[in-house]
Amino acid sequence: MTALIAASNSAAENLHFVTEEFPPFSYSRGAIASGALPEIVNATCLLLQWRCRIEVLPWRRALQQAEDGEVDGIFTVIQSPARHQAFLITPMLVTSGYDFYTLRSNNFHYRQPEDLRGHQVGVYGPSGTSFVLQESLKNTPDVEVKLVTNNHRLLLMLNAGRFGEQGVVVLNRDVARHLIEHEYLYALRNAGHLTSISYGIGFSRKKVSPAQFQAFNRGLGTLRNNGQLATILQRYGLQPAN
């Protein structure tokens, strides 16, 4: 452990991370970044004796700052060609899924992309969710995808019937669970599973050195091995990635 801390101290002293409102993975509580991923980042930085700051921003601004190298890291990040081009990505930390939701009065249930023909599908984007949805619809015509600025607004619009009687939305199931419980959106129901997904932390290729990235990964490995990472995730009802 001493060697790990000594090596990491020489690699970096201050890191600036950005994230978004994506509860329970990350969210703001006043001026404090809270949620599972901020706890994991803070625990890793404490282990490494790094000074780390986490800022909660609208996703597009956070992503732009990270891609431009204005900040060191960003989360949550999926495995995709665009993300790998811009970021060094940690091993996946948490696994979840993208599910469909609709009004209880709608009998829609998703089994395959063809089921979405003739439907308007709402999704938060541009985001990892919208990327995965659009990839799944490449060979499926007659589907209108509507991008919405955040998941909270997405579910409120669905609840208000803004996507029509046959409208559906797709979003992260853990985010949906959190928002439905906290906003009492019990007129909504799960309408099927799109795909499983895992998230990690991205480090800007324009800002962070390979040595810094490797040191952070070693810190994450220590948290994984001593059970602290799983304990943090379980506190938020989340599943560690394999």
Provide a role label for each language-model segment.
Residues T19-E21, T95-D99, H182-L220, Q239-N242:
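Periplasmic-binding protein-like
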